Amino acid sequence: MAASVTRVLKGAGGRQLLLMVARRRPVLMQPFLLMPRKFWVSSALRSEDQRQPPFSASSTHAETQGHAEEQYQQKQPPPRYTDQAGEESEGYESEEQLQQQILSAALQFVPDFGWSADAIAEGAKSLDMSAAAAGMFEDGGSELILHFVTQCNLQLTELLEKEQKLVQLGTSEKKPTAQFLRDAVEARLRMHIPYIEHWPQALGMLLLPRNIPSSLKLLTAMVDDIWHYAGDQSTDVSWYTRRAVLTGIYNTTELVMLQDSSPDFEDTWKFLENRISEAMTMGDSVKQVASTGEAVIQGLMGAAVTLKNLTGLNQRR
């Protein structure tokens, strides 16, 4: 059955079909997707046993090297930045912290400047820094988008964890799986609303070859988190099919949202509800798995055409 899934999904390009990357995955993973990235915030909250990697000499060496680098960094003076008056100031523990602050501040300027270095420069100025601080980002627009997606995924994880704790405390009823999935995807997509006019630009940039590994890792981590908090503990082929299906639902709903002019995106949420309902009635037979793969492929092809038409245009009329 796993071979059938692999043959069906192998031929299509796009970020859904590399869904194999996730923290609690079975062993058939693509190793090149596990490379760390500077701005990543882990969105999966697991037990220590689940997080613990297997012991190896290389991991021991990495830990030793990391400890040495940490000691070196502790000896260095704190980074300086230049404010708008041209004076140098200190106030951030690390360059990474400074970059995170600038990117977060830049988000409020995306509606006016798009996902661009200009938005980052305005964000720096809002923190009383020189606009030249935007120069510390090699690919400003892409880094701003990836920062935003990372923060959205983190917010979703915090929301799902809070709901889980309420259920564990007995103060809230456990939702049926279909409702849980629908609410989780809707909550995540609603985070795009303040930036919806510029989201076609964001999707186009996320699909650039240099950004695909990062955007895929964020997407698969988000989907895996949703299934984790939904209570999925499968270890067979259904682990893959469930994540493939939810990824397809998320991406197609995201595209529907870009063209939805109904009040509060009502048509989008109705579309999402219908897709979730259909997915929950699907079994794990070989024929149904194949149908799922074909649907994902068709969704990818449709997404590529739609994005080509949407990118850079004002879609919501």
Curated annotation (Swiss-Prot):
Disordered as annotated region, ranges: 50-97
Biased composition regions of type Acidic residues, renumbered to the chain: 85-96
Molecular function per GO: isoprenoid binding; lipid binding; protein homodimerization activity
GO cellular component terms attached to this protein's record: mitochondrial inner membrane
Gene3D superfamilies: Tetracycline Repressor, domain 2
Biased composition (Polar residues): 53-63
Residue span of the annotated presequence: 1-46
Residues the entry annotates as binding a 1,2-diacylglycero-3-phosphoethanolamine: R243
Signal peptide: none
Origin superkingdom: Eukaryota
InterPro entries found in the cross-reference section: COQ9_C, COQ9_HTH, Ubiq_biosynth_COQ9
Record's keyword terms, sorted: Lipid-binding, Mitochondrion, Transit peptide, Ubiquinone biosynthesis
Record-level GO BP terms: ubiquinone biosynthetic process
Record text about domains: Structurally similar to the bacterial FadR protein (fatty acid metabolism regulator protein).
Annotated family: Belongs to the COQ9 family.
Biological role: Membrane-associated protein that warps the membrane surface to access and bind aromatic isoprenes with high specificity, including ubiquinone (CoQ) isoprene intermediates and presents them directly to COQ7, therefore facilitating the COQ7-mediated hydroxylase step. Participates in the biosynthesis of coenzyme Q, also named ubiquinone, an essential lipid-soluble electron transporter for aerobic cellular respiration.
Subunit field text: Homodimer. Heterodimer; two heterodimers of COQ7:COQ9 come together on the same side of the lipid pseudo-bilayer and form a curved tetramer with a hydrophobic surface suitable for membrane interaction. These two tetramers assemble into a soluble octamer with a pseudo-bilayer of lipids captured within. Interacts with COQ7; this interaction allows ubiquinone (CoQ) isoprene intermediates presentation to COQ7 and facilitates the COQ7-mediated hydroxylase step.
Descriptive protein name: Ubiquinone biosynthesis protein COQ9-A, mitochondrial
Species this chain originates from: Xenopus laevis
Gene symbol of the encoding locus: coq9-a
